[in-house]
C-alpha cells in the first residue's frame, strides 16, 4: 500500500513499509540519492533520523496516526505521573531535612538547577520546553543543528551559566558505514561527543556541570568517555523525544548533597536502561531561608 512519488511532500507524516510502519516519521527533506528519490525523515516520537526511498513510504492518514500515537501518549502520561510522584517525594525529603524533621517552622525557598537545552529538532524542543514548564524546571532552550553544537556550546555556557546541559536532537547507527564501535558509522554521535568535550573544557568537574548527551542509537560509550554524566544509547535503541527532560529534571530537584542513583533516574523514563545510562551524579537543588512574603503579595 505505498504511495506515488507526487503524493509525498515535505512535512508529510509517513511510515516505512519495510518496517511495517511501526514508527511515524515526518519528511524534512527530499533528495536524489543514487538516482532514487529519497526522503530524509525525523521520527515523530523518537529521536531517530533516517533516509528512505519513496517506494518504501506510505503516507499516514490521521486515523492511522492516532492508532500508532495512542500507545505513546498513554506511556507519556504514565511516565509523567510516576515522575511527578518522584518529585513530590524529593520535595518532602527536602522539607523534612530543612525543618529538622518538622520540629521547626522555617519559611524556606528552593533553587533548582538551571538547564540549557540544545536541540537539533525545533518541534521536539517545543515539546520539551512545555514539559519543563509543567514540572517547574528553569530552562533556556536553543534550537541548534547537531553539527553546529561543538561551535555553539562554549559561548552559550558563557552566556547562560547553566548547572545542567542537554545536547540532543536526532541520530542513527548505519550498519553499512561500519561496526557499532566505529563512531563514524553514526549520523551525529561524533558531533555530540565534540560538544561534550567543549563543555567539559569549560567545566571539568562532573558535579559542577551535569551533561546529558545523545539521541536515538547514539554511541553511548564515547559520550560517557568524553565527559557526559548521562547519555544514550547503551543498546543502540531508539529513545523517546522527552526522555532527556525526565533525566535532568530529576537531577534539578535532588539536593546538592545527595547523589542521584542511575537506576532511580532512568527507571521511569519511556525508554529505560536499554536506551539510557550514566554515572552516579550529585543533585543541584539548593535550599535557602528565610522566605518572606512581601506586603504586595
PLM segments and residue spans:
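Mixed-charge, Lys/Arg-rich low-complexity intrinsically disordered regions
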Residues: 1-10
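Short beta-strand-centered aromatic/proline hotspots
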Residues: 21-32
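Short, solvent-exposed secondary-structure boundary/capping segments
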Residues: 33-42
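Intrinsically disordered, low-complexity, charged/polar segments
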Residues: 45-101
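Short helix-loop-beta junction
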Residues: 129-140
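Proline-aspartate-enriched helix->loop->beta-strand connector
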Residues: 157-170, 228
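Catalytic cores of nucleophile-dependent amide-cleaving enzymes
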Residues: 193-239
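C-terminal functional extensions of proteins
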Residues: 238-297
Amino acid at each position: 500500500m505505498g504511495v506515488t512519488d507526487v503524493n509525498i511532500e515535505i512535512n508529510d507524516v509517513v511510515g516505512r513499509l519495510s518496517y511495517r510502519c511501526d514508527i511515524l516519521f515526518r519528511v524534512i527533506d527530499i533528495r536524489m540519492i543514487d538516482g532514487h528519490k529519497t526522503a530524509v525523515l525525523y521520527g515523530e516520537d523518537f529521536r531517530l533520523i533516517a533516509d528512505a526511498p519513496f517506494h518504501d513510504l506510505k503516507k499516514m492518514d490521521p486515523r492511522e496516526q492516532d492508532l500508532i500515537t495512542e500507545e505513546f501518549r498513554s506511556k507519556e502520561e504514565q511516565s509523567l505521573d510516576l515522575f511527578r510522584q518522584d518529585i513530590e517525594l524529593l520535595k518532602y525529603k527536602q522539607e523534612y531535612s530543612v525543618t529538622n524533621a518538622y520540629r521547626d517552622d522555617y519559611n524556606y525557598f528552593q533553587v533548582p538547577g538551571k538547564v540549557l537545552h540544545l536541540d537539533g529538532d525545533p518541534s521536539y524542543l517545543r515539546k520539551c520546553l512545555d514539559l519543563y514548564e509543567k514540572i517547574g524546571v528553569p530552562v533556556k532552550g536553543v534550537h541548534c543543528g547537531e553539527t553546529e553544537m561543538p561551535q555553539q556550546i562554549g559561548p552559550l555556557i558563557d552566556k547562560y551559566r547553566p548547572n545542567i546541559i542537554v545536547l540532543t536532537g536526532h541520530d542513527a547507527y548505519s550498519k553499512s558505514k561500519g561496526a557499532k564501535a566505529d563512531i563514524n558509522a553514526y549520523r551525529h554521535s561524533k558531533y555530540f561527543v565534540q560538544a561534550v568535550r567543549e563543555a567539559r573544557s569549560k567545566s571539568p568537574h562532573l558535579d559542577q556541570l551535569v551533561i546529558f548527551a545523545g539521541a536515538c542509537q547514539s554511541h553511548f560509550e564515547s559520550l560517557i568517555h568524553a565527559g557526559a554524566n548521562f547519555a544514550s544509547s547503551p543498546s543502540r535503541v531508539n529513545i523517546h523525544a522527552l526522555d532527556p527532560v525526565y533525566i535532568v529534571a530529576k537531577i534539578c530537584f535532588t539536593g546538592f548533597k545527595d547523589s542521584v542513583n542511575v537506576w532511580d533516574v532512568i527507571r521511569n523514563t519511556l525508554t529505560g536502561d536499554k536506551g539510557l545510562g550514566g554515572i552516579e551524579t550529585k543533585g543541584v537543588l539548593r535550599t535557602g531561608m528565610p522566605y518572606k512574603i512581601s506586603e504586595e503579595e
